Amino acid sequence: MVAKLIDEDPEQAYAYSKVALRLASRVAAVREAAGFAAYANQKFSEALAEFRAARRMTGNIELWPVMADCERGLGRPEKALDMAGAPEVAKLDKAGQVEMRLVAAGARRDMDQLDAAIVTLQSPELASNSVQPWTARLRYAYADALLAAGREDEAREWFAKAVESDRDGSTDASDRLAELDGVEFVDAFDETEADEAPVAEVGPKASASDEDEPWVEDAEDVEEFYDEDDEEFEPEEKDKG
């Protein structure tokens, strides 16, 4: 029930997760679901505690990227970067490594390190013309970082590539591309303006070779890895908006 409601009604999902915790707090799947429900409601301190509990129960490393993103949500991008440089990252599958790269780039941006964020996102997965579940989000994040750095032409190119790969509409890349092109969309049912709506163009596909080596944040850019189990559940800090 929690998983079904997270996207449609995150508040209701969170309420269900609290009930589930009261009934089965020793079940790892319940702790993980509670973590995602709290995460969806930006209750990052609570989410981090639940993810840590689930990981202790199972030893599963898959939650590592979202745990790092919780650190970002709590205003601790340095800790997120610590986690990006930890040995656990090499144990993640390809999707997990891409997710970790996205989190690390976000942490760099939190610290106003735009150039470092751009470099962090540059990877074989970004350049590949193979479309994977993570491709649209990776290209979108790269385009957004380029735009924030004032590199508008490059940003437009990568928003176009994100549009090409966004088969399920997981990003608003088409809207961002249209905005850069000066295109204004109107309501199709507005008879007075329907004939004036131009059509946005989509740029060319990316092309590059793929590589399979795992990515880990450069050791020079991160501090010594901390053991997440050293920190017990903390009173919830003010979450990032």
Regions found by a protein language model. Give the residues of each.
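Structural motif corresponding to the intra-repeat A-B loop/turn of tetratricopeptide repeats
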Residues: I6-E8, N41, L74, M111, ...
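Residue-level signature for tetratricopeptide repeat
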Residues: K4-L5, A37, A68-C70, A107, ...
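Intrinsically disordered, compositionally biased tail regions
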Residues: A208-G241
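Structural register within alpha-helical repeat arrays
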Residues: M1, A33-A34, M67, A104, ...
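Alpha-helical segment of the N-proximal tetratricopeptide repeat
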Residues: M1-R22, A33, Y39
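TPR alpha-solenoid repeat register
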Residues: V30, L63-W64, A117, D172-A173
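TPR-repeat structural position
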Residues: P10-E11, F44, P77, L114, ...
